[in-house]
Amino acid sequence: MKKNWFCNILLTLIVSCSLFIQVAEASPNAAFAKPQQRVDIGGRKLHLYCSGTGNTTVVFDAPGSHGGWAWFKVQPEVAKHTRACVYDRAGFGFSDPAPRPNTSENAVEDLHKALQVAGINPPYLLVGNSLGGGNAQVYAYRYPEQVKGLVLVEPQTEDETERLNKITEGKIKQFDAMWKEVNAYCLGEAIKGFKKGSKALANCVGNQVTLYGPVLGKAVASIMMKPTYWQTRVDESNAFNSSDEQLRALRKPFGDLPLLVLTRGVNENAIPGKPQSAMNKAAEDENEKIHKEIASLSTKGKQRVIPGASHIIQFERPAAVVQAVLEVLKLIE
């Protein structure tokens, strides 16, 4: 979820989710650390990275505040079976910023144009985590003839904020406000220029080498030091409500579209060795209920809990995500 209060609050606000620190391993794939294919979509360029061959192209959309590097543990494995593409939304990674709101509809339009220009033809199997999961649903509604399957990893949905905010007695919206404050703070520091060894650098950028390994980590850190990156985070978070409303306006059954929804099996706010609070348990139950509702929108929909994984499942249990993608791919082909 885009406003997942179950993460450790401080680290969540700084580097998106504390679980990255605990579970990320060094990436053996330096391809994610540099531009691969920058496609002109009308005066600005969107970055794509594809590898593998096959009749169906798997397209990955990252969680909020991330570029395609979020899939560095999954994309190479899927590419052993078919063509697999990651992309950077406008303003992230190696993509140019957009002179318009960073909503789901606009992200989908950008991706659609980029795939066309790059000659990456359908059918597509879309895979999205968190905000990327919301975008994948919007794409499937806008271009149903192109999308032959969906794998939604802890996906954003149009009413999750209100439902979980009610259960958590306002904590979701409190987190949203803190998230925006931190983004604004880091944007200001990026504009001034991060200084080596500074508290601002540690708080806003962190140790990406620990997260992604020496090559990719250095590249991600370099991107996170740019004002463009933080401005895009500000813009994207400001557009969350609009993106929710766009998905709400499109919402309808998916028919018989192969669909697999992956749900976290770990409550990130639970203290190891201590009983889970009633509020945490209620929120986890509601999160799973929301995902089951999404899966029920397709006659070929399934929902699966991934034990040991939290919100960013592709970091903690990448094999489970790869397995899900290959299962849906088999149904398509």
Each model region followed by its residue ranges:
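Bacterial N-terminal signal peptides
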Residues: 9-18
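Conserved HGGG/HGGXW glycine-rich cap/lid loop of the alpha/beta-hydrolase fold
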Residues: 41-94
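Flexible "cap/lid" subdomain of the alpha/beta-hydrolase fold that forms the substrate-access gate
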Residues: 151-293, 301
